[in-house]
Amino acid sequence: MELPPQIQAQLMQLQQLQQQLQMILMQKQSVETELKECKKALEELEKSSSDEVYKLVGGLFVKRKKEDVKKELEEKVETLELRVKTLEKQEEKLQSRLKELQEKIQKMIPTAQ
């Protein structure tokens, strides 16, 4: 059975939305992983009794003040948390659009037969 062009177009749009959602989910997972690493680094930094620590910069370890590194990590955590929230909002919008489109397609299919 050949689907009408209108349904085919809707199915293509559905597929594009699914791909967008997959990309958002992959980005979110990546950002969440980086966020966990930053939080773990902050935890380890808190355990250190030294005023100076070594930070990896472009393949080299550079001695830095503990407070400077801590501040950088806290800012990075804040930025990453914001990014996760943004991605979650995008994910919710895409999920909603996907659901609406699926319902629309299901309503169209019985009329096409």
From Swiss-Prot:
Family according to the record: Belongs to the prefoldin subunit beta family.
Gene Ontology CC annotations of this record: cytoplasm; prefoldin complex
Protein name: Prefoldin subunit beta
Highest rank taxon of the organism: Archaea
HAMAP family: PfdB
Gene designation: pfdB
Main localisation: cytoplasm
Database matches in CDD domains: Prefoldin_beta_GimC
